[in-house]
Amino acid sequence: MDWKSDDRLGCALAQALARLLPDAPGVRVANGGEAPENFTGTVRAFAPSHVVLLDAVDHGREPGTVFLADERSIAVGDMTSHHLPLKLLMRYLSGSIPCRVILVGVQPLTLRPGKRLSAPVKKTLAPLAGFLAQTLRSPGR
């Protein structure tokens, strides 16, 4: 994979959550990499009530800012490096599975080629992973 620096965030979050939630009931963590659409069969087979996508998305905010979005608040042109735009993936998932699809996005500093997360995005990683793990472990989530 030819990763672009901050675009590694989604995979890094998925890896952290897999470590933090190895046996959490009702939770599956899938690392979609640069083609999350390839995991739609796995997601459909699990039949979740919610799908949470984790990604670095240029949404015009301060780098490192975390935001929640649903399909209606994501523009087709919002910059990501995935083969299928996130809006279309979100629409497909919510149309093929009776579930709520949510994006937890982080504003990247850069999506240029690189091997490391930028400082503001890296600073967000551990606290966001901890918050998500705690939320997903909570009863009545």
Task: Briefly describe each language-model feature range.
Residues M1-P108, K115-P139:
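N-terminal catalytic or cofactor-binding beta/alpha core of small enzyme domains
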